[in-house]
Amino acid sequence: VEFDYIIVGGGSAGSVLANRLSARETNQVLVCEAGEDTPPGKVPSEILDSYPGTAYLNDRFIWSNLKVTTEVISHNDQDAPKPPLRKYEQARILGGGSSINGQMANRGAPSDYDEWEARGADGWNWESVLPYFKKLETDLDFDDEWHGKDGPIPVRRVPEAHWSGHSRAIFETFKRANYKYLPDQNGFFEDGFFPVTISNMEEQRVSASMGYLTAAVRKRENLHISTHTSVTELLFEDTRCVGVKALVKGKPEEFRGREIILSSGAIHSPAHLMRAGIGPEGHLRELGIPVRKPLAGVGQRLMDHPSVAIASFLNPSARVRNQESRRHMNLGMRYSSEIGDAPAGDMFIVCTSKNSWHKVGEQIGAFLVFVNKTFSETGEVKLNSPSWSEEPSVDFNLLSDRRDLDRIVDAIRRLAPLYADPAMQAVTSNPFPASYSDKVRQVGAINTKNKLLTGIAARLLDGPKFLRNYLIENFLMDDISLHEICNDDEMAEAFVRRAAVGVWHASCTCRMGADNDPMAVTDNQGRVRGIAGLRVVDASIFPVVPSANTNFPTIMAAEKIAATILKRD
């Protein structure tokens, strides 16, 4: 079969494109997904779960060999040791990130998209993208000019009656601290706290593949979904991309197509381009890859949202009670830091009442702090070798802009006094600065040993107060207290630099931009510059990461580009 469209990656963007492009019967559409299928009626229980921790920590659903650095790399001191490599969970399953993520369904600030257009992505301002945000969703709670009512992805908020005791205490505390209550996170964009919007219906995740690749859509004879299919090479005739080579369940295959669309995410899409000789010329020559098209921006200016947490021990009455809801995040807040020219609503706090799948995780609640409008954009993706089977080298360089570090320290110092509120005092104790360290990741690995060990530790934590204090200080805490962060600038900076991690919102490595922008990889329709028949459609085309969890912006972008393609054809 000669395909009209070959989509490399069946994630959030790929699922949308597969549905929309195959809706026209004359289009033959192939989706190549390296991971497993999530067929209707047979979606793994870990994926369906409202609590996502058993999905995103499961090696079955991720690129398990992917490691990245997050700390800033010194370019002044060539002898400085490289920061430690950390695991970075990226989905390897139909539905992509939407199959394993925290199900957070938000859009960002209108100013984010006006900035996209200002940076050269013509036609991507807020007014132009809002119709596609509405098109993708059915909001189950609100029906007004901000919301969609017949899209494939349901959006809702967990009702207050189903919140954990911890969430209720935070609600009271935010109110007493004079933060404004907003019933709708996705309504008019302003500072305040709100029930977080989630892509979930009747206590089950609804991923992009579940929403867009339904049983009815899968019956289309012109749509071909090939899972367990690793694309190993892009095929070219001169500067036209004409197909892909792939391993389908281990067997070599070749597929030809009129247009190839990379939807492999902000780490793997640029890697596909560079292996094909499209990217920074010097880097390609170093690896002996013949240069097909020099594009300096491929893999450059990688972004994510820097994050740290303040955790605390939860009394039994405050924990997630799995009967009504397994959701661990009920409330969020955005506020304006007013630091370093940051726009309004630049900071985001999400309140979690469970921090891992195991028994100790159930005893720990946290404020997760995101720099939602980050200024750090010096990360990069490079190849380690020309081989398709070797993961790329990924350096996020989080906090490369000092303003991001200052805003995280400021956030910790704003939140710490809230633990003195009577509502928080009644349900939490032992607040401490926390990080998603390798130690935490190891204990979070899903296996019998961790289940047994955390079961024992949890019983001890629920024991006498002196024992709990000892265990938290010696096993859960870093080597710094909340008091020290609040009172010592040097200690605060050292902790945040070491502890800050990204929140799986990798973006911007194949940015859209104007014709005269030497760092623009794609035009405003995702078409790769100087190469015919090749597009990128995923979070890597964002000109800058929006002030949002990136799943809905990615789905929106795929909806918008799919509409453009169908209009053109």
Predicted features and spans:
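N-terminal redox-cofactor-binding region of secreted/periplasmic oxidoreductases
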Residues: 1-569
